[in-house]
Structures are given as C-alpha cells and as structure tokens.
Swiss-Prot record:
Its EC number is 2.7.4.8. It catalyses: GMP + ATP = GDP + ADP. GO terms for molecular function: ATP binding; guanylate kinase activity. ATP binds at G12, P13, S14, G15, V16, G17, K18, G19. Keywords: ATP-binding, Cytoplasm, Kinase, Nucleotide-binding, Transferase. This is Guanylate kinase. It comes from the Bacteria. Belongs to the guanylate kinase family. It is found in: Cytoplasm. Essential for recycling GMP and indirectly, cGMP.
C-alpha cells in the first residue's frame, strides 16, 4: 500500500503505452478523476470547454501562472498548456484520487508544487521494443521518430526520480501493478 495524498502522476516516454494504461485504469476505477488541462489553443471541432480542456486566452493563462494557479505548465507550439491547481485540490479535499498523465518536465514541476503526490514512471521492456512500438504506429516521419527516440533516451535516464517504475511489457500485468501501487 502506498501512502500519498490523492494525487497520482503517470509519465514515461512517447510510445510506452501511458494513454492505453490510463484509459483502462479509468474504465476499471471510475472513482479516479482524470485532471482536465487548460490550454490557450483554439478548440478543435467537437471539443467542449470544461470536458476536453479548459480553453483560456493568453492573458487568463498568464494571470493563473502569476497566481501559482497551475501544478505544472508549459508552452508548446506557440500555445500554453497546464494543470489547474484548484480543480485538483478540490477533488482531493473531498477524498477523490486525481490522476495526471503528463510529460517528464511537467512531472518534475508537480514534484516541486505538490511533493506529496505519488509519481509513477512507465518504462518499456527495452529501448528496442519502444522503437518498434513507435515505428509500428505508422503516424510519424523518420525525423519525428528520431526526435521521439532521442527524447525517450533522456526520459529513461530520469526514471529513478519517480516513486515507482512500472515496466509495460504486458499491458494487463502493468495495469495490475499500477492498481496495486495506488490502492489505499
């Protein structure tokens, strides 16, 4: 059993299966609340404010940054993205588990702003397997694949910064391990 204050962070390199694990975890554990990110990007067709993202203008976003209103935030491709602190703290205060699926830099920020959270690093069984997974997606150019692989090398070096490491070799076993780690 793990002792933490309701905040669960899941991170790991691209292609490791974070998204699939999180979807299965949420399906089997509806009491866990997946944090909704804020962004300054324009909503895509069908996206709903407050469900898919909290859509803010840049001034609103920067005001929240200045007021320490985010557990973590970053700028990507000219837009800001962040995890609002108030919504996570509100859910935790009523006993809910809050899950963040974020990148390494975001996880490091959360460690500073919410050190009592529990952080899990999802790792591949090997770097070769990770490369195979990324390549078989068939969605990226060779340049994008190389970029993802270079970033993955850096991220894998950081795995010991986390409270737990789960190797995603077999999805069901990795999922079971995550459930054991966050059981309270």
């Amino acid at each position: 059993m793990t002792n933490y204050n309701g905040l669960i962070v899941i991170t790991g390199p691209s292609g490791v299966g974070k998204g699939t694990l999180v979807k299965k975890l949420l399906l089997e554990n509806p009491e866990i609340w997946l944090s909704i990110s804020a962004t300054t990007r324009t909503p895509r067709e069908g996206e709903i404010n407050g469900k898919d993202y909290f859509f803010l203008n840049k001034k609103e976003f920067i005001d929240l940054v200045d007021k320490e209103g985010f557990l973590e935030w970053a700028e990507f491709a000219g837009n800001f993205y962040g995890t609002p602190r108030a919504q996570a703290q509100e859910k935790i205060s009523v006993g809910k588990k809050v899950l963040l699926e974020i990148e390494l830099d975001g996880a490091r920020q959360v460690r500073k702003t919410f050190p009592e959270g529990f952080q899990i690093f999802i790792a591949p069984p090997s770097f070769e397997e990770l490369e195979k997974r990324i390549r078989t997606r068939g969605t990226d150019s060779e340049l994008a694949i190389q970029s993802r692989l270079n970033r993955a090398k850096e991220e894998l070096l950081a795995k010991n910064e986390f409270d737990a490491i789960v190797i995603n070799d077999q999805l069901d076993i990795a999922l079971l391990e995550i459930k054991k780690l966050i059981k309270s």
